[in-house]
């Protein structure tokens, strides 16, 4: 279970870490994750940190040095930037895994690759040897999510049945 700790302080989430033994956390902003999950917290408690918010190309280096997994790879330009950063290796790279974010509801206000462009993005990632371990989506708000979850399952099975699915809801 990925615990989304956005808008919570380290003090707020310490009971999750200490008492409930949660080790898998999601953050939607790099700056907030940096302040909350300092190196001592990550190493002392063996925290695995996932980026679940949009990633700007100018922040790729920072994200690769902080998050174990980036769940919001959603466009070819971002894949190019990730690949370039990994090739340069000017800093310790923490990120080992990536998810492709799918705009499953085709909503213009949301990030994510469109369904009909997913295969091309997936192939590009494989060409660059990025370890794609799953697909991520956030279904439209205020509607029954099941049809979107089913569509993601079909997409995953068509693309690669071994991929994981991360299908979150804010409400």
Q: Which residues does each PLM region occupy?
A:
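Conserved alpha/beta-domain cores
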Residues: 1-171
């Amino acid at each position: 279970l990925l615990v989304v700790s956005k808008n919570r302080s380290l003090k707020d989430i310490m009971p999750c870490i200490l008492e409930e033994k949660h080790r898998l956390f999601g953050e939607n902003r790099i700056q907030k994750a940096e302040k909350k999950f300092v190196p001592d917290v990550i190493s002392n408690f063996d925290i695995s940190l996932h980026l679940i918010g949009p990633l700007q190309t100018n922040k790729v280096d920072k994200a690769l040095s902080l998050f174990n997994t980036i769940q919001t790879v959603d466009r070819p330009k971002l894949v190019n930037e990730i690949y370039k950063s990994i090739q340069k290796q000017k800093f310790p790279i923490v990120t080992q895994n990536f998810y492709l974010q799918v705009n499953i509801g085709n909503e213009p206000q949301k990030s994510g690759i469109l369904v009909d462009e997913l295969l091309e993005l997936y192939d590009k990632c494989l060409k660059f040897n990025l370890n794609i371990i799953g697909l991520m989506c956030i279904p439209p708000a205020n509607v029954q999510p099941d049809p979107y979850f089913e569509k993601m399952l079909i997409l995953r099975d068509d693309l690669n049945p071994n991929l994981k699915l991360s299908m979150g809801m804010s409400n």
